[in-house]
Amino acid sequence: VGFSIVLALFSSCNNSKKGKDGRTDTYSSGTISFVSDESFSPIIEEERAVFQYDYPQATLNPIYTNESDAINKLLSGKTWLAFSARNFKNSEIQSLKAKNFRPVAIDIAYDALAFIVNKGNKDTLISVKDIQDIMTGRITKWSNLHKGNAHGTITVVFDNPKSSTVHYVEDSILGGKPIHNKNVVAVNKTSQVIKYVEENPDAIGIIGNNWLNDKHDSTNLTFNKNIRVMSVSRIHPATANSSRKPYQYYIYNGEYPLVRTIYALLNDPRQGLPWGFAHFIQGPKGQRIVMKAGLLPVLGDINVRDVNVNQ
């Protein structure tokens, strides 16, 4: 109810007014462009489609790029909304405020970082320490990871060298240190990471879990059948009992170790359509879309029920 009232107030107050910058968009109408890390495109596209259906006078034009370029566009005033896996830095907030912007970060979802391997690779358990050793080059072969694995040199596959995925690995898994592995491949998009892993038996790919789920499974417990999703353990060595797949429940209870927040970063002094879209995602309908997509909502009641997993 509160969201509807605010929406109506902004629409009626701003609908016919043009700002000094020439903008005419309101909380629920007009045309804007926004930027997003490409790894979040599935969930952002779902949110955008519903928002534009509910508010047909609004047009949202997405630009999907890497996290670094997305935030640079936001900081330089080329856009008023960016979706990222990191919050503003204090220095960025001060810089934007000095330019009369209004930097605000809104939590919209929790996403898990998933490790995927070829369908022919039977090893599906990995510990955080194993991941650290692979990323720093201490482990280079599958046989170093698990004795008896006949696969050869491990090829690590990322979506983009400047993506939120790489940033998370370096910042949260490696403690701020860079990746040092000679066998790293950076493709252009997350869909290409999945394709690379499908076609290369020695590959291990790192993607956001909103790319994994079978859209026909309302329980979000069925992953893409063309690849294997690894179970990750905080404890080393990884065992079946200590390892978890990036299911919503394990994100919710904290047992899956690789979880990140998705932020809507705003620098819009007008509080127009960028604010409307960001708050829609954080609102009841937007959070239901987040849940349906296999991510974890930041707001709302979570109901847990038992299901059988045949995977």
Show where each model-derived region lies:
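Acidic, polar ligand-binding/catalytic clefts
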Residues: 83-106, 234-244, 249-250
